Regions:
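Long, contiguous binding/interaction regions
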Residues: 1-80
Length: 80
């Protein structure tokens, strides 16, 4: 079954370490990113990015795994 919405939540716990790398991945995988929303949470020392992805399943999995491998980054998924 093909999903209509695949949402990734990215919590950047260490923005001084991870922000640039997350941004590079977002740019590199721009063809599968349909929508993104960033929420700055200074009181938590980081921020959240919500990303709606679409396209090739292999590319989506690679994007998720590369994000999850970054130090200071936590990745969660919602699939509808």
């Amino acid at each position: 079954m093909k999903h209509e919405y695949e949402i990734i939540g990215i919590f950047i716990r260490k923005p001084d370490i991870a922000y640039d790398e997350v941004q590079k991945l977002m740019t590199g995988f721009g063809c599968i990113v349909r929508t993104r929303l960033g929420i700055n949470r200074e009181e938590l020392g980081g921020g959240i990015i919500i990303v709606d992805i679409t396209g090739d399943e292999e590319q989506k999995q690679l994007f998720r795994s590369k994000l999850a491998a970054l130090e200071g980054v936590e990745v969660q998924e919602m699939i509808f």
